A protein has these predicted regions:
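Helix-centered, glycine/charged polyanion-binding patches within enzymatic domains
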Residues: 2-7, 194-267, 275
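Residue-level detector of alpha-helical secondary structure
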Residues: 13, 17, 58-61, 79
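Polybasic low-complexity intrinsically disordered regions
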Residues: 41-57, 65-71, 75, 79, ...
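Basic, amphipathic alpha-helical segments enriched in Lys/Arg and hydrophobic/aromatic residues
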Residues: 2, 53-65, 243-307
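Sequence-level motif detector for i,i+2 pairs with an aromatic at +2
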Residues: 3, 23, 113-115, 253
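Short arginine-rich
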Residues: 84-87, 294
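Basic, low-complexity segments
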Residues: 1-45
Length: 307
């Protein structure tokens, strides 16, 4: 079968969005500059914070986008302020490292309304370990540490609606309830792979009145109770011998957009985390998600099939 060909119909707009990704003013905007220093009165005793949460978030975002260390990010942002003749200073790298453990990095977009298809998947981000070339040539060492990034993506807009970072030993199904509870928007259907075919995931989707598009595992049995979505998928599997027809009739293949999101994460920001503390790694991962959503909002390709 010949490979399908597509043509981008909004190339001028998308091309400009790609160029803007390299603009420092795209990431260090007026909103961040105006709210750089903390203005709120502290609610507890102790030394007040000098820099706002938005300032710390902005530093973490720039660090991920341009793949800098914290020290390099400090020097980079200070030089930008100097060139712009703006009387601001970047937080010290040690301050950013400390504040990253407690900062709440907001990645949600102002988009509202119903979500037709929410697609869910996870990927690994390396914290410690050798590169793939060394593993291929000499084998892996015992100490390899990873974190799992869980994402829920709107298949129509490509925006990341929910995101979470967990330890490597947390399964996808265990992380699912906390992930899906991050949004209160109405969702028609949620699609995920067979790793989410557990009662825990189906119960959470039923509680939120979301149609479950999760393929049952091979040889799966019926579940008693109110699991109509899954039992229909099991019945289809038994009649046809596979999940292929069920996937086609339910539009399950839109779930590939979640894999596209994972690919964008790795290609744009790399596949590793650099902060040492786990809470800091959570902030670093959420800054990555915030940056990806900002890129998505700036412009995405719109394509039509031509062959």
């Amino acid at each position: 079968m010949a490979k399908q060909k597509f043509k981008i119909t909004n190339w001028p707009t998308y091309n400009k969005a790609l160029i803007n990704r390299g603009s420092i003013t795209f990431w260090l905007d007026d909103e961040a500059i105006q709210a750089w220093y903390e203005s709120a009165t502290p609610s507890s005793r102790g030394r007040p914070q000098r820099y706002s949460d938005l300032a710390i978030t902005t530093v973490l975002v720039i660090k991920r986008v341009f793949r800098l260390t914290l020290r390099a990010a400090q020097g980079f942002i200070d030089s930008i302020f100097s060139l712009m003749n703006v009387p601001l200073r970047c937080p010290d790298y040690s301050c950013v490292s400390r504040r990253a453990k407690s900062v709440n990095v907001s990645f949600k977009t102002p988009t509202r309304g119903e979500i037709a298809h929410l697609v869910i998947d996870s990927t690994g981000l390396k914290v410690f370990g050798e590169g793939e070339w060394k593993v291929k040539k000499h084998g892996q060492e015992r100490r390899r540490i990873w974190r799992k990034l869980h994402l829920a993506v709107d298949s129509n807009t490509h925006e990341i609606i929910c995101a979470d970072l967990s330890l490597n030993n947390v399964t996808d199904s265990e992380a699912f309830p906390g992930l899906i509870r991050q949004t209160h928007r109405k969702i028609r259907a949620a699609a995920a792979d067979g790793a989410y075919d557990t009662r825990l995931c189906h119960d959470e989707l039923r509680r939120k009145k979301i149609s479950a598009l999760i393929p049952p595992r091979k040889g799966a049995g019926y579940w008693p109770g109110e699991y109509a979505d899954r039992n229909r998928a099991v019945a289809n599997q038994r009649m046809t011998g596979s999940n292929a027809r069920w996937k086609w009739t339910t539009d399950y293949n839109r779930r590939s957009i979640a894999e596209t999101a994972m690919y964008r994460v790795k290609q744009l920001f790399g596949g590793s985390l650099t902060l040492r503390d786990y809470d800091g790694q959570v902030a670093e991962a959420m800054a990555l998600v915030r940056a990806l959503n900002k890129m998505t909002k700036a412009g995405m390709p719109e394509s039509v099939r031509i062959a």
